[in-house]
A protein has these predicted regions:
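Terminal transmembrane helical module of multi-pass membrane proteins
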Residues: 133-200
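Membrane-proximal helix-loop-helix units in multi-pass membrane proteins
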Residues: 89-146
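Membrane-interface helix-boundary motifs at transmembrane edges
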Residues: 4-10, 69-83, 133-145, 192-199
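Juxtamembrane "helix-exit" motif on the non-cytosolic side of transmembrane helices
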Residues: 70-73, 98-106, 134, 159-167
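Hydrophobic cores of alpha-helical transmembrane segments in multi-pass inner/ER membrane proteins
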Residues: 17-25, 52-67, 119-130, 176-191
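N-terminal topogenic module of multi-pass integral membrane proteins
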Residues: 1-77
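Non-cytosolic membrane-interface motifs at loop->transmembrane helix junctions
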Residues: 42-45, 105-118, 169-178
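Transmembrane alpha-helical segments of multi-pass membrane proteins
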Residues: 80-94, 145-155
Length: 200
């Protein structure tokens, strides 16, 4: 029985969202126009796509918050700083998609939209960094690969941004799918028992 259980493929708690819904919807929106010449805010600024864009952002924001808090529970992480960053990141993303991106008609609102959308993944990355520091206390060696993957993802995002000179749809798709995959990877590590607390 134990051997059969070990052979089972890993299934994450939110695999339906992680593997299909969130990245799939992002890909659909990004594919409406060029991945490299525009971004989701511009693509979805027309009236027909605004509702879909808002629903996508709300879904993604809630998903990232719930998944991250689930990982916090697995890792027995209760520090307020990380939780506050997650709430703020999710709130920023949801607020961003609810603010219409109309730089010609409402330039100040457009600036706020861009700022909130930019800060959301940055704050989430900050929360995950605090979480990794906490769970690495038991054995940093065990989480070395998790740290490396985080730096690679962040370095890749920075490289895409510097190459393009602005936030394009490819970068948005990269960040969304990268975060989905990284959260699932952390869940797999924690559920294997590499956690400061085994009481979960």
């Amino acid at each position: 029985m134990k051997q059969e259980k070990k052979r089972r493929p890993f299934r994450g708690k939110y695999d339906g969202f992680t593997l299909f819904l969130v990245p799939g919807l992002t890909l659909c929106l990004a594919s409406l126009e060029s991945w490299f010449g525009t971004n989701l805010s511009v693509v979805c600024s027309s009236g027909g796509l605004r509702l879909g864009f808002a629903l996508w952002g709300i879904l993604a924001g809630v998903y990232y918050m719930r998944y991250t808090f689930y990982l916090f529970r697995l890792g027995n992480y209760r520090e307020g700083a990380g939780r506050g960053l997650v709430f703020t990141a999710g709130g920023f993303l949801i607020a961003a998609v609810l603010i219409p991106y109309e730089p010609d008609l409402k330039p100040q609102a457009a600036i706020l939209h861009v700022a909130l959308a930019f800060l959301a993944p940055v704050l989430l990355a900050g929360a995950l960094t605090l979480f990794l520091r906490f769970i690495s206390r038991c054995s940093r060696k065990r989480f070395r690969k998790a740290w490396q993957i985080m730096w690679y993802l962040e370095g890749g995002a920075l490289a895409v941004f510097l190459t393009a000179g602005f936030i394009n749809s490819f970068l948005e798709l990269y960040v969304v799918t990268g975060l989905c995959g990284y959260l699932r990877y952390l869940e797999r590590l924690l559920r294997r028992g590499i956690s400061p607390s085994r009481s979960w």
